[in-house]
Amino acid sequence: MIGSHYNSENFNCAHFVAQWYSDKLCIEIPVVDEFELSFVRWMRKHFVKIDKPENDCLVNMQSDNNSHVGVYSDYGVYHNYKVGKSKGSVVHWELGVVMRNYKKVTFWKWSQ
């Protein structure tokens, strides 16, 4: 998955998370065109917030006007990241890098 290119319509951060959960955990997450409020509402119904990250937990990252989602594993966060007009791709960031780049970071564990 690392290196898979970002596409806002076909493979954005929510698509990546849905693929991760489907491939690794056999959990189907609805895919949305872009990460939006409806996904957050769905997430809060099916995940429980946890204080510390655990392998395969969902990571919700927020900055001023943006929400972003990834998955915690291998002591960091895998996420499909795009800056400006770059192509973007799936990357793995250490947790400290995530915390420095986003104002609010929360962790969510599958609850069903």
Residue ranges and their predicted role:
Residues 1-2, 87-112:
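Non-catalytic ligand/cofactor/substrate-binding and regulatory segments of enzyme domains
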Residues 2-54:
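Catalytic cysteine-centered active-site loop
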Residues 32-87, 91, 96-97:
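...with weaker cross-activation on analogous glycine-rich loops/strands in unrelated enzymes
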Residues 5, 20, 46, 77, ...:
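Intrinsically disordered, low-complexity N-terminal regions enriched in serine/proline/glycine
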